[in-house]
């Protein structure tokens, strides 16, 4: 008689979906921070709460995976992939919060067009990430999400370059250039982490198909 496979731990799938929603919320808050400077302080507090929530979700996933929580069933995919996906999702929120924190730390008083546009790219990529994470339940192949996130990542690269180039072209204070370069880099790192998530999910889907 063949051995019966344990059922998948639905709690882990729920936590990944929760992480996707948190990634979306963090990206929306950052976009609003870059678009609405007078209301930046309360948005920054909410973004910090997202970062703390991301840490809590990551902690719960790892504890559940290690058998330290109320795990019921086997992981939905290989443990190494669970760890890497958890870490990278947390990175997205960390980079978003780092960007928001830099806006306050550097005393940025006015938005840059390219930074606002790059935050919109992050919102789009985060939406695709959240959609893909919901697809873990159904065994989706994530191809459409990977293509769109890759397109958005390329757009983010262009906006980053254009933003930094415009700073040098206008001859602003070198300290302002350094501060905005730092902001652009953390913003783009958040978008890059979205693409990493997409590649991880594609790899998970491939392993599933190979059985």
Where are these regions (language model features)?
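Cytosolic, long alpha-helical scaffolding segments
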Residues: 1-211
